[in-house]
Amino acid sequence: SRNNRILFNGKFSKNINSKNTVSKLFNFLERKKLINQKYLIKITKNIPQKSGMGGGSMNAANILKYFIKKNIIKLNTKQISEIAEYIGSDVILGMDSTNSILTSKKKIKRYRKCKRLFTLIVKPKFGCSTREIYSHVKKFDKAKFYNPQKKMFDIDFLRKTNNSLEKIALKKYPALSKIKFYLKNLKEPIFVRMTGSGSAIIAYYATKRQCDIAQKQFNKDHKKYWCISSKTI
């Protein structure tokens, strides 16, 4: 084949645009003559589209990491940042699976051995368009993470922060408000927050047992919603 082939399978593989983060990555690599072969890429899509969890960005990041690890392409730090930024602002976060802060000046700081939290991730049947949610932003908040510190991963700090896009999404989609209210009263989570521009809502728990019990109860009461438990890195 004269073109790269990107195949998606899995529960959330339907209706993925042919112009996506992975095709964007390959277009960039070919334009810069960093690759000269054609590839068949198979991706199992386990993360829902339009959930605000950056699944597409992480797909591209992991393929780029693989190419670097296998010496298929040789890149310096500046080139990696350039490629990541071209694909999407959060792609750079996926280049190293650890706790990271991306500052407003596009600098990244990574931290090891942060406290692990257990998460219950819930998504209704509808998704949120990032472009649409951002179009309702009237005023941007002052940057809070220009001076990253490890304490920003402490529970007390995280509990006091907020997602500036949450108010917009919850106003547009009242169902999200109901989910958040339900989760806040489900087995005493540390805090509950919307992901990115939505539509997934995450409840954070101190123990796996609390999280598992909460998941069981949520699934019992909301059979039509996607719900999965996980943990922070």
Region locations from a protein language model:
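Glycine-rich, flexible beta-strand/loop modules in the N-terminal catalytic cores of phosphate-handling
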Residues: 1-29
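Conserved, helical-rich catalytic subdomain that frames metal- and/or nucleotide-binding sites
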Residues: 6, 20, 94-96, 100-191, ...
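Short, contiguous, well-ordered secondary-structure segments
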Residues: 20-42, 181-183
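Phosphate-handling active-site elements
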Residues: 31-40, 66-87, 207-218
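Short pre-catalytic strand/loop immediately N-terminal to key active-site residues, enriched for Gly-Thr
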Residues: 39-52, 192
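DPxDG-like acidic metal-binding loop motif
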Residues: 51-77, 93
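Conserved glycine-rich beta-strand-loop-beta hairpin in the small C-terminal domain of fold type I
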Residues: 198-201
